[in-house]
Amino acid sequence: MTQAVLVLDQRLAARADQADLLLPLTADERSVVRGRRRTDCGREVLLQLPRDGALQPGDQLSDAAGTARVEVTAATEALLRVRATSALALMQAAYHLGNRHVALELHEQDLYLLEDAVLATMLESRGLQLSRCQRPFRPEGGAYAGHQHG
């Protein structure tokens, strides 16, 4: 017997108890708070959340009755890891990628971005070391990430 689609329309204000289900989402999927998704065990859910900001790993969602708790997790994605021989070279790479509005995850020694052949060529031409990896992607929110239009 097929389970009914679980409609998630509530963001829980504080992290509650253990979640019943995990919902792995890519960075792009976390920015869209409406639509059909699948939990890690294959249960279909329908997001119908208020448009008040992107979802973050660790956020917990619920149905209107509060009978199900679903925790958002960061899904594994194909990424490029960028390393440089100096902090300045790494900052320059971040600057050039930022000019192209590329989502970046920033660390002291490296940058992560979604895999992209054109950007990989540009970065390699600047002398940066690239490696491909599969891991959750948690990009910076951007200058206006917390801004709400009212």
From Swiss-Prot:
It is found in: Cytoplasm. GO terms for molecular function: nickel cation binding; unfolded protein binding. Keywords: Chaperone, Cytoplasm, Nickel, Nickel insertion. Its main location: cytoplasm. One of its GO terms (biological process) is protein-containing complex assembly. GO terms for cellular component: cytoplasm. It comes from the Bacteria. InterPro entries: UreE, UreE_C_dom, UreE_N, UreE_N_sf. Belongs to the UreE family. Involved in urease metallocenter assembly. Binds nickel. Probably functions as a nickel donor during metallocenter assembly. This is Urease accessory protein UreE. It comes from Parasynechococcus marenigrum (strain WH8102). The lineage of its organism: Bacteria, Bacillati, Cyanobacteriota, Cyanophyceae, Synechococcales.
